[in-house]
Amino acid sequence: MDWPHNLLFLLTISIFLGLGQPRSPKSKRKGQGRPGPLAPGPHQVPLDLVSRMKPYARMEEYERNIEEMVAQLRNSSELAQRKCEVNLQLWMSNKRSLSPWGYSINHDPSRIPVDLPEARCLCLGCVNPFTMQEDRSMVSVPVFSQVPVRRRLCPPPPRTGPCRQRAVMETIAVGCTCIF
């Protein structure tokens, strides 16, 4: 082999052998770079073991949190309030916003969880931060996010059989914002 082929061969071998080597961070920031995958240590559990321990633990916890939020919403006066006003004395961010929102309960019997808190804008316009009055030159619009739910899939009424469940993402209003 002549020298260009030898050089190409050596370059190929070095690249092939270097693929398994960890790379150093390329950023010039001081401190640590982006964290890599967790290596098991005396106080760390490998990520694959965490996911194998209880696959539905996170979803069950999520559904329990949603149920608690709905219960708190039902026990408060939040559902009755429909005023377009900002209350800076409250700690809740939805009432301190320039596009305040309240919550309603989105009920769907074929979904798990059956009830989801959903944001609804309290103003058509936005609250002017200087006058603290509604300004209709701007518009309050809902902000949407996708949340994981399970859908009950049951056979049509003439047929009988077990219902199945399917995990899906559903779009829900989670807050409001101001646009021009």
From Swiss-Prot:
Residues 1-20 form the signal peptide. It comes from the Eukaryota. Glycans are attached at residue 75. GO terms for biological process: cell-cell signaling; immune response; inflammatory response; positive regulation of cytokine production involved in inflammatory response. It is found in: Secreted. Keywords: Cytokine, Disulfide bond, Glycoprotein, Secreted, Signal. Residues 22-44 are annotated as: Disordered. One of its GO terms (molecular function) is cytokine activity. The keyword Glycoprotein applies. GO terms for cellular component: extracellular space. Expressed in adult pancreas, small intestine, stomach, spinal cord and testis. Less pronounced expression in prostate, colon mucosal lining, and ovary. Gene3D superfamilies: Cystine-knot cytokines. Disulfide bonds join 121-176, 126-178. Belongs to the IL-17 family. Stimulates the release of tumor necrosis factor alpha and IL-1-beta from the monocytic cell line THP-1. This is Interleukin-17B.
